[in-house]
């Protein structure tokens, strides 16, 4: 009897232990299934919401009343700018009042706050430049932008920094000044050459004893033998020297006639001076 009494609590404990483990396992399994289901539904819901917001963000008509002053407009100086923003493509379409055009510009970055915009405007202001020709291929634009612009010609709006504009103007000005300076240099050289020629001394006064000036006198008494000029000793009619060259060949001798009996031909040049220069040199005037 004692043995049975001692064994009874042990058996009862052993039967209770597996039941507790089974309950814990069932609870954990149910919690795991519920968590997986929640994660699945949460992922599906987030994906659906993301797709909906992406569709709604494209081509939202945003009309903003902005008080602006438009030149060459109607009697009223107030107008309304209407914009259509395509966030997916990063393009904004703009319509100005009184303008029969539709402008598109790229969204380089998100809009700045008022403080940042003020600082940005102080650092470097942007100037928008319109393209000269309208857009030819508009296939990349969204249907909302095409519907917004309708049949109006579409032009690109490009931002240009004021510093870049000043730099481009200065480069054009420098190029113009450089070309003008290059054109002025030949004229300046011609003027300086003419002034130097005018300032150059005209030479010594008339000297009747100088052979150079004797032919300029009324009598012209100095006469030279024409054979001096014929033999190449001096030039009777020249006022400046000149170089006279001739070909000198040495005869070979032998059977072959001229020009095969000559070899070693070389040019020999002489400086022919005016005969009046020689006469002036003899007289000691030169």
Curated annotation (Swiss-Prot):
Summarize the PTM comment: After cleavage, the post-translationally modified ChM-I is secreted as a glycoprotein.
* Disulfide bridge positions per record: 102-149, 234-238, 235-275, 245-269, 249-265
GO cellular component term, pick one: extracellular region
Q: Would I find Cell membrane among this entry's keywords?
A: no
Basic residues: compositionally biased ranges: 166-176
Annotated region (Disordered) at: 166-220
* Keywords per UniProt: Chondrogenesis, Cleavage on pair of basic residues, Developmental protein, Differentiation, Disulfide bond, Extracellular matrix, Glycoprotein, Membrane, Secreted, Transmembrane, Transmembrane helix
One biological process GO term for this chain? Answer: negative regulation of endothelial cell proliferation
What positions does the record give for glycosylation?
Answer: 191
Which positions, given as ranges, span the membrane? 29-49
Alphabetical list of Pfam families matching this protein: BRICHOS
Query: What are the BRICHOS domain coordinates in residue numbering?
Result: 75-157
Propeptide section residues? 166-169
Write down the PANTHER family for this protein, in alphabetical order.
CHONDROMODULIN-RELATED (PTHR14064), LEUKOCYTE CELL-DERIVED CHEMOTAXIN 1 (PTHR14064:SF6)
Q: Which family does it belong to?
A: Belongs to the chondromodulin-1 family.
Q: What does this protein do?
A: Bifunctional growth regulator. May contribute to the rapid growth of cartilage and vascular invasion prior to the replacement of cartilage by bone during endochondral bone development. Plays a role as antiangiogenic factor in cardiac valves to suppress neovascularization.
Name of the protein in question? Leukocyte cell-derived chemotaxin 1
Q: What's the gene?
A: cnmd
